[in-house]
Swiss-Prot record:
Cofactor note: Binds 1 nickel ion per subunit.
Keywords from the UniProt entry: DNA-binding, Metal-binding, Nickel, Transcription, Transcription regulation
Function, in words: Transcriptional regulator.
HAMAP family given in the database record: NikR
UniProt protein name: Putative nickel-responsive regulator
Organism: Helicobacter pylori (strain Shi470)
InterPro entries per the UniProt record, alphabetical: Acetolactate_synth/TF_NikR_C, ACT-like_dom_sf, Arc_rbn_hlx_hlx, CopG, CopG/NikR_regulator, Ni_resp_reg_NikR, Ribbon_hlx_hlx, TF_NikR_Ni-bd_C
Amino acid sequence: MDTPNKDDSIIRFSVSLQQNLLDELDNRIIKNGYSSRSELVRDMIREKLVEDNWAEDNPNDESKIAVLVVIYDHHQRELNQRMIDIQHASGTHVLCTTHIHMDAHNCLETIILQGNSSEIQRLQLEIGGLRGVKFAKLTKASSFECNE
């Protein structure tokens, strides 16, 4: 029999809210298809923890991970090569890229990155600022591993 991990146990606690905040919370539960208030609150806490974790910019912390989604005009001269050059010159580890042809003019690329937050964000800004790039969005993530 497996011994329960302390992270697996659920702790119940109460929160006091004004009625308008509770109404907004309940509206989001319905709108986003959550099964309970607890599920929504857990997601909101995780999102805030990722945001705070990324704000702590330690240059020696190479554990940040993110996905950069880029849509660009593949007819833009040398754009693809410039994007590759930026990735190679960056201090960020490019773990994986996926490239798809959306239509006759546009490509979508996902780039999975690992490194410190400032290097990852710098790479996103450099690629996003290239002529021919129509969209560049960075999605920040965390595994929520606890260092004990």
